[in-house]
Amino acid sequence: MAKKKAFSPIFHLSFIVFLPWGIYLSFKKCLGSWITNWWNTSESEIFLNIIQEKSILENFIELEEFLFVEEIFKNNSETHPQEFHTGIHKEAIQFIKIQNESYIHMILRLSTNLICVVIISGFYIWRNETLVILNSWSREFLYNLSDTVKVFSILLLTDLCIGFHSPHGWELMIGSIYKDFGFVQNDRIISGLVSTFPVILDTIFKYWIFRYLNRVSPSLVVIYHSMND
């Protein structure tokens, strides 16, 4: 009976970890060909080209300038307009293919992640028993820890999330989320999130210590302040 009781939380925890991964891979494989075919219709091209028009024009102008300079260095003389335009045409086709693949992957990642979030959220709402079992197991596990271990875990977690070196970690994590959802990386937005999100977390954590830990375990608060100082 005890073995079965110990196995149940591990099973549910493994289920929560591997279910999103399995759903993501399955939908990514299934939706790939469908999104590629949808992209090749004129409606999708018009819609996305309007959104990305500025980016495409800037990249194409840079490509044209690069090819012009490269042609000058190759010939060391006056360039031939016909050859130059032919080269631009070939490179432009290659550039459009790369952009096309980039947009397909962007839509695929975004749609797959959104579908996964909806399915997993619905599943956990429907199977509330799984979350109840994990909640009771985690409460029992934390209750059996000593106050010193609890404080050490809190300090380690807070230093990782809102410590001196945490901005670099937040930058990598937010950048990976941007990439995973298929968004174009924006350094200004990422910098703003990195500079504000840890501050918000720090405020929430201090409020939690003040309201919850003082009420539940005053000795834990004393040990926390002693170790933190």
Swiss-Prot record:
Q: Which reaction does it catalyse?
A: K(+)(in) + H(+)(out) = K(+)(out) + H(+)(in)
Q: Does the keyword Transmembrane apply?
A: yes
Q: Which domain of life is it from?
A: Eukaryota
User: Where would you find this protein in the cell?
Assistant: Plastid membrane
Task: Name the InterPro entries on file.
Answer: CemA
- Tell me where the transmembrane regions lie: 7-27, 106-126, 189-209
Q: What does this protein do?
A: May be involved in proton extrusion.
Family, per the entry? Answer: Belongs to the CemA family.
This one is known as: Potassium/proton antiporter CemA
- Recall the taxonomic lineage recorded for the source organism: Eukaryota, Viridiplantae, Streptophyta, Embryophyta, Tracheophyta
